[in-house]
A protein has these predicted regions:
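A conserved mid-protein helix/loop that constitutes part of the nucleotide-sugar donor-binding site
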Residues: 19, 171, 180-194, 214
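Membrane-proximal helix-turn-helix segments that form the acceptor-binding/catalytic region
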Residues: 103, 108-132, 140
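Nucleotide-activated donor-binding/catalytic signature segment of Leloir-type glycosyltransferases, i.e.
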Residues: 214-235
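Acidic donor-binding loop of glycosyltransferase active sites
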Residues: 245-260
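Short hydrophobic beta-strand element within catalytic cores of glycosyltransferases
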Residues: 270, 274-278
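Conserved acidic donor-binding segment of nucleotide-sugar-dependent glycosyltransferases
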Residues: 290-291, 295-301, 310-315
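A short, well-ordered alpha-helix in the C-terminal region of glycosyltransferases
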Residues: 303, 310, 317-332, 338
Length: 345
């Protein structure tokens, strides 16, 4: 079968939205299909919204592919008689983040009209799909709430999970992610001030917002935490990441209302490490069961500090939660064989 994988991307920004496409391409080719990736750029600037949507609508793959699978918006606008969606999120500033601090434009007549138009167009285009899958219950719930559309949950695996394993438990809680305000690395730093154990933090990831990165370093200096906090202000290699995860105490991932459980959480699970997250972290809560394969706490410094101490001081429980984290993947049937079966059914 000739399959086109259609998605959008933000230039010079790598992350899960690209991984899900590229990793699926590998698995589909392994299954004997012809696969082509189709990308167009997209940014959340309101004045570019409609032109970008039109560009996707004009893409015609009808005679070139037997099926298209669409991921990141507005790729779902591409018309095709055999269109499948693996929908990973909306343009969130016009949906669930409209009333949040992350909307950078005014709530005025102009932008409300953009929002209303986007909702109408999205609903129409999504309804064109033969099947609609999502990467989390969170996203499925948003589709129901905002577009009145039902969907099937299909959790995304990672590439070559057999690369990851546990090599023991050191004193570091590791956070592998882009360094951004909504990923809330600052919460962990604030929590470290209240810990009673000598637990350490390690942040691995690039900061695109320089001011936020500087704020984090200021907190470290102000509270004399230099000996307990390390920053890898870059994208560490896959080999480095595998080693860091294999040796760490636990993995932290606490974004605000995340679209899915996030690849850092899944990589932690394959590495046999418990996940530290918060109850408002969206899709992460679908993967983590508190006290079983990680700890879910309130998004406050003191609650996180208590959890960090627990991970450090009760190593037997920490190790058992790590074993359970690996088992949790099988419990949720997170595998490429399941993904291929559902997307091509």
């Amino acid at each position: 079968m000739k399959i086109a994988l259609c998605s959008s991307f933000v230039p010079f920004v790598n992350g899960g939205a690209r991984n899900i496409v590229e990793w699926l391409e590998i698995e589909l080719k392994r299954a004997g299909h012809q696969v082509e990736r189709v990308y167009l750029p997209q940014v959340d600037a309101p004045d570019l919204l409609m032109p970008q949507m039109m560009a996707y609508r004009w893409v015609d793959l009808t005679k070139l592919s037997d099926r298209i699978i669409c991921f990141r918006p507005p790729a779902h606008l591409i018309p095709h008689p055999n269109k499948i969606l693996w929908f990973i999120h909306h343009v969130r500033v016009f949906y669930d983040l409209w009333d949040s601090e992350y909307r950078s434009f005014p709530d005025d007549a102009k932008h409300r009209s953009f929002r209303a138009a986007l909702h109408r167009v999205d609903t129409s285009a999504i309804n064109e799909a033969k099947k609609v899958f999502t990467n989390s219950k969170v996203v499925s719930d948003r589709l129901t709430k905002y577009n009145g559309i039902g969907s099937e949950l299909l959790y995304p695996p990672i590439a070559m999970p057999e690369r990851f394993s546990s090599a023991g438990f050191n004193d570091e809680i590791v956070y592998v992610s882009r360094v951004e305000h909504h990923k809330r690395q600052h919460l962990l730093l604030q929590a470290l001030k209240y810990t009673k154990s000598p637990v350490k933090l390690r942040f691995c990831g690039k900061a695109f917002n320089v001011s936020y990165a500087n704020e984090l370093r200021t907190v470290v200096a102000k509270h004399s935490l230099n000996s307990r906090v390390s920053f890898d202000d870059r994208w560490i290699s896959e080999e480095e990441k595998i080693k860091v995860l294999s040796e760490c105490l636990a993995v932290a991932y606490l974004p605000i209302d995340e679209d899915s459980y996030g690849y850092p959480s899944l990589e932690a699970s394959h590495s046999g490490k418990p996940i530290l997250s918060t109850r408002d972290s969206g899709g992460v809560v679908e993967l983590v069961t508190d006290g079983y394969n990680g700890l879910l706490v309130e998004p406050t410094p003191q609650s996180l500090a208590d959890a960090m101490d627990r991970l450090y001081l009760d190593r037997a429980v920490t190790m058992q939660m790590g074993k359970n984290a690996t088992a949790r993947i099988k419990e949720l049937n997170i595998s490429w064989s399941h993904v291929i079966d559902r997307l091509l059914s």
